[in-house]
């Protein structure tokens, strides 16, 4: 079996996690108490969904997940919510004291008291796996727990499970909407460690997802639940091929192989289609060609950055539902002819496709319409550098005056860490610039000879 362990850190990670597990349970027909009426082979661990759930002798399905937060309120909602019987109580780990939006508290003072307990729980989950494939880590980089404790845990996972892939779903600060004043500090410090300790990072940003909810689903005032359910669809599409059988399955390590040209250039942009409300769905065809075109629309990107300002290096299309390879090939051929979608000249093919026959499931009473087919795109584009340069600019404005820095230094950080992290990000922006630059200078000499 190729098991995957999910780790949900802090408020953002926990709430996205709730939406994901709610959706997984619906997709597999698992009830909130963990029973699965359709699963006849009790305790027989070879079904595809066992990558995400372990089965007890009593036929209960337990998610291979850990929820961690430095303060209890958010995880207490899981402990008392609909799915309280689904999780083993040991999988929900909380501290007593908040990280207070402070990276240093999450990473040094408070984080280090709880990190060994967390790794111990992860170790227990890993011991139940026959062939652990890797980790999915969910957190935000703007808060204190997600950024500080998230980085700490990723660093420790690298030490303990060096070769296992770590895929990271990180909520980045939005351009306009801010939840904390010190977001730029936390994000820069956290990205510094994401660069080193994750294999692929998927960027999400609340503002972009708000806009999609407003525009495509006609929700006037989207709540975090609306946002998280949309994100859950994306994550579910990524992991469908691990949990169901399909025509063109995609393994976790395949994402890395196909999307990451250089180790540092591993920040992906996600988009999903069709995002459509039930009223509209009746009047639209939503063919494979249509949904393929819409995942390339800048307005459908889940992070605020415009892919037209950059070039694509690689792109992964995960289809699910009623889709055949012939339609996919035709749609991709059309995309390749479009002038607006530019690839770097050193990556001529650039598309990885996956197809899974399990149609998308929707949460009853949710906003999305039930559709026959959907596609999720993960793309590696040089435009994502916009996200970093935006955060870096805000960081510089604050750091020039050393504003708020004493809170971090007081928790045992050194000022040098700020400048080190900032330099690392400056180097990352430069890397993106160079990757997108025309490679014609290098190839200039050879062409004259032929």
UniProtKB/Swiss-Prot annotation:
Q: Which reaction does it catalyse?
A: GTP + H2O = GDP + phosphate + H(+)
List residues modified as N6-acetyllysine. Answer: 40
Q: Does the keyword Iron-sulfur apply?
A: no
Which GO terms label this protein's molecular function in UniProt?
GTP binding; hydrolase activity; metal ion binding; structural constituent of cytoskeleton
- Return the EC number: 3.6.5.-
* SMART domains with a match to the protein in the record: Tubulin, Tubulin_C
Q: Which cofactor does it need?
A: Mg(2+)
Record-listed GTP binding positions? 11, 71, 140, 144-145, 179, 206, 228
Would you tell me the Gene Ontology cellular component terms?
A: cytoplasm; microtubule; nucleus; spindle
Classification via Gene3D superfamilies = Helix hairpin bin, Tubulin/FtsZ, C-terminal domain, Tubulin/FtsZ, GTPase domain
Q: Which UniProt keywords apply?
A: Acetylation, Cytoplasm, Cytoskeleton, GTP-binding, Hydrolase, Magnesium, Metal-binding, Microtubule, Nucleotide-binding, Nucleus
Describe the family membership recorded for this protein in Swiss-Prot or TrEMBL: Belongs to the tubulin family.
Functional summary from the UniProt entry: Tubulin is the major constituent of microtubules, a cylinder consisting of laterally associated linear protofilaments composed of alpha- and beta-tubulin heterodimers. Microtubules grow by the addition of GTP-tubulin dimers to the microtubule end, where a stabilizing cap forms. Below the cap, tubulin dimers are in GDP-bound state, owing to GTPase activity of alpha-tubulin.
Q: What is this protein called?
A: Tubulin alpha-1A chain
Q: Which organism is it from?
A: Physarum polycephalum (Slime mold)
């Amino acid at each position: 079996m190729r098991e995957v362990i999910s780790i949900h850190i802090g408020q953002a990670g926990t709430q996205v996690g709730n939406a994901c597990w709610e959706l997984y349970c619906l997709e597999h027909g698992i009830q909130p108490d963990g029973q699965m009426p359709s699963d006849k082979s009790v305790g027989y661990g070879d079904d595809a969904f066992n990558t995400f759930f372990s089965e007890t002798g009593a036929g209960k399905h337990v998610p291979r997940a850990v929820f961690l937060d430095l303060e209890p309120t958010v995880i207490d909602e899981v402990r008392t919510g609909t799915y309280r019987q689904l999780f083993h109580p040991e999988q929900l780990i909380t501290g007593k004291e908040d990280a207070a939006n402070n990276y240093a508290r999450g990473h040094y003072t408070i984080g280090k008291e709880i990190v060994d307990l967390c790794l111990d729980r992860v170790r227990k989950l890993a011991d139940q796996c026959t062939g652990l494939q890797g980790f999915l880590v969910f957190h935000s980089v703007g808060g204190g727990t997600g950024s500080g404790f998230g980085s700490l845990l990723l660093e420790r996972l690298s030490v303990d499970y060096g070769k296992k892939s770590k895929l990271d779903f990180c909520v980045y600060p939005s351009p306009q909407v801010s939840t904390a004043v010190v977001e730029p500090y936390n994000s820069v410090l956290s990205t510094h460690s994401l660069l080193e300790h994750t294999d692929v990072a998927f960027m999400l940003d609340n503002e972009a997802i708000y806009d999609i909810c407003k525009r495509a689903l006609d929700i006037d005032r989207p709540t975090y639940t609306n946002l998280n359910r949309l994100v859950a669809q994306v994550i579910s599409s990524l992991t469908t091929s691990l949990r169901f059988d399909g025509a063109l399955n995609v393994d976790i390590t395949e994402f890395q192989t196909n999307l990451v040209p250089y180790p540092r250039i591993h920040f992906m942009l996600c988009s999903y289609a069709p995002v459509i409300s039930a009223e509209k769905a009746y009047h639209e065809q939503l063919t494979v060609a249509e949904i393929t075109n819409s995942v390339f629309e800048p307005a459908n990107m889940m992070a605020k950055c415009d892919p037209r300002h950059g070039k694509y290096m690689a792109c992964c299309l995960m289809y699910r539902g009623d889709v055949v390879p012939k339609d996919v090939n035709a749609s991709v051929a059309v995309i390749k002819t479009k002038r607006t979608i530019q690839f770097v000249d050193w990556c001529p093919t650039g598309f990885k496709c996956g197809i899974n026959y399990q149609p998308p499931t929707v949460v009853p009473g949710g906003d999305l319409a039930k559709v026959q087919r959907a596609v999720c795109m993960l793309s590696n584009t040089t435009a994502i550098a916009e996200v970093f340069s935006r955060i870096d600019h805000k960081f510089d404005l604050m750091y020039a005056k050393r504003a708020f820095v004493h809170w971090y230094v007081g928790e045992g950080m050194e000022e040098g860490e700020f400048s080190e992290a900032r330099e690392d990000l400056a180097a990352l922006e430069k890397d993106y610039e160079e990757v997108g630059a025309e490679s014609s200078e290098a190839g200039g000499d050879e062409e004259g000879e032929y």
